[in-house]
A protein has these predicted regions:
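Short loop/turn segments that connect beta-strands within beta-propeller blades
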Residues: 176-181, 238-243, 281-286, 326-330, ...
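Beta-strand-rich domains and repeat architectures in extracellular enzymes and scaffolds
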Residues: 131-135, 139-173, 430-432
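A short beta-strand motif characteristic of beta-propeller blades
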Residues: 137-144, 182-192, 243-249, 287-296, ...
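Beta-rich, blade/repeat-based domains predominating
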Residues: 144-160, 167, 193-208, 214-219, ...
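TPR/TPR-like alpha-solenoid helical repeat scaffolds
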Residues: 73-75, 101-127
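Helix-turn-helix repeat elements of alpha-solenoid scaffolds
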Residues: 39-51, 84
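Short, conserved, GDST-rich strand-edge loop motifs in beta-rich repeat architectures
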Residues: 213-230, 411-431
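Short loop/turn segments immediately following the C-termini of beta-strands
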Residues: 167, 216-218, 272-274, 282, ...
Length: 452
């Protein structure tokens, strides 16, 4: 589940976290840095602002928006640091190399001096290229219910159907895999949420005939009663009947938005609001206890993906990028963006041997992309965009890999909502569209290759 609060100072102001004790977790560090950015910006203390922006850049592993913060500060200190404009240009060039585009550089007065530099035309040209449509997927099916706010999807292979979660209608629906794309598909209700909350993540345990899902009364959003905001739970249904078998509530203030099913049937859920990763044993005889398996390294973890060795998780953090979590040692490391790969804003993530398929609704532009890793799965060597800037791509969320075909929700509907989950004035929900892209088989990855 994507981060629905604005992440960086470029977009919003943060609450006064600076009065809190010295930060330990990544979330606390992030809040403290944001407070420094806000205070130094208000005081026009650009040297302090640059220091805070660089700390944020380091914490967020070269998140593209963090690069813009650094560039802005560098422009403002050009009278103190004569190379400020040149340094800012370098940050913006890296932003563009990462496949990003923004009108912020053109519209804000902060970058006015850069617009007179010879490099600016190249930046504009390259950002325009980054906005060019790419369409390697085709429509697989269209759901007739435009009010679903479809979030996650998995496949029940035995019954040839997709199960799809609905945020707005608080349920899981079923739709046949064999539906034609030429007409809206027939959908049926699989199971309701036990509470008046959105159902968010879903994973099907075909071996044990179970459906795992999460429900979440998301803070500040109109989809749930205000009295329930901050509550969340893991759910388990019978795959055949849709009967609710288990409900395990998470810590208050959490939002279980994404999920991974392990081969032994255990479930990993991520808390995009509180920054935690939790493991729930599948054995019904086990206590309904959620074990936290991280140590505060994450700000907003999203959909984990299991590496082929079965011992490591790829964990996308909406803010910090792509992490690798060792399930045995719980040690966390981060994939390097290498100045050219944007790894932030990933909502759905799926592993296919040495490939990672990512649904990025937090990049600019939003996109569905395939990353190829080296043999040890420690370094990204190339990327291939599946879909970007097309009429069918609204706000993509999650997908499922069936053989070499990747099916994904292309236009969930989040992009027409305001900060409280209400439909923007004049906007009209569209029918959810499931796209299908054939993913190339894993390729040898012994060397580096350019962006594709």
């Amino acid at each position: 589940m994507r981060l629905h609060t604005a992440p960086l100072l470029l977009i919003t102001a943060l609450t006064a976290a600076a009065q809190q004790p010295a930060p330990v977790s990544a979330s606390a560090q992030f809040q403290a840095i944001q407070s420094r950015l806000l205070a130094s910006h208000a005081a026009s203390d650009w040297l302090a602002n640059l220091a805070a922006a660089q700390d944020q850049q380091a914490l967020l592993n070269d998140d593209p928006a963090a690069l813009l913060e650094v560039a802005r500060a560098e422009v403002h200190i050009r009278d103190v640091h004569l190379n400020g404009d040149i340094a800012a240009i370098r940050e913006l060039q890296q932003f563009v190399r990462m496949g990003q585009s923004t009108d912020f550089i053109e519209k804000t007065p902060d970058f006015a001096t850069l617009r007179n530099r010879p490099e600016y035309a190249d930046l504009q040209r390259d950002m325009a290229a980054n906005r060019a449509p790419i369409a390697l997927a085709a429509t697989a099916l269209v759901l007739p219910d435009a009010n679903l706010l479809a979030e996650d999807i998995d496949v029940d292979t035995a019954r040839h159907r997709f199960l799809i979660t609905s945020v707005r209608e608080h349920k899981i629906v079923a739709v046949s895999v064999t539906n034609s794309a030429s007409a809206p598909a027939a959908i049926t209700d699989f199971a309701p949420a036990p509470d008046p909350w959105p159902i968010v993540a879903i994973k099907i345990d075909r071996t044990r005939s179970r459906v795992w899902a999460t429900e979440s009364a998301m803070q500040g959003l109109s989809f749930s009663p205000k009295s329930d905001w901050g509550r969340t739970a893991v759910l388990c249904y019978d795959l055949r009947t849709g009967k609710l078998l288990r409900r395990v509530e998470g810590p208050h203030g959490s939002a279980f938005g994404d999920m991974l099913l392990l081969p032994n049937g255990d479930v990993i859920v991520s808390d995009g609001d509180g920054g935690g990763l939790y493991r729930l044993a599948s054995n019904p005889a086990s206590p309904d206890h959620l074990d936290r398996i991280d140590h505060g390294e994450f700000i907003s973890p999203q959909t984990p993906a299991l590496a082929p060795d079965g011992h490591r998780l790829f964990v996308p953090d909406y803010e910090r990028g792509l992490a690798i979590l060792d399930l045995t040692t719980q040690k966390v490391s981060w994939l390097a963006p290498q100045g050219r790969f944007a790894l932030n804003g990933i909502d759905g993530l799926y592993c296919n041997r040495n490939q990672l398929i990512a649904v990025q609704n937090g990049t600019s532009p939003e996109r569905v992309i395939l990353f190829t890793l080296d043999a040890p799965l420690a370094t990204i060597v190339s990327e291939k965009i599946i879909e970007r800037a097309t009429p069918t791509l609204g706000d993509p969320t999650h997908g499922v890999l069936i053989g070499r075909d990747f099916y994904y929700i292309a236009n969930s509907g989040w992009d027409i909502l305001d900060a409280h989950g209400n439909i923007n004035s004049g906007a009209k929900p569209s029918q959810p569209r499931i796209m299908r892209a054939t993913v190339p088989g894993p390729q040898p990855s012994t060397g580096s290759s350019p962006r594709q």
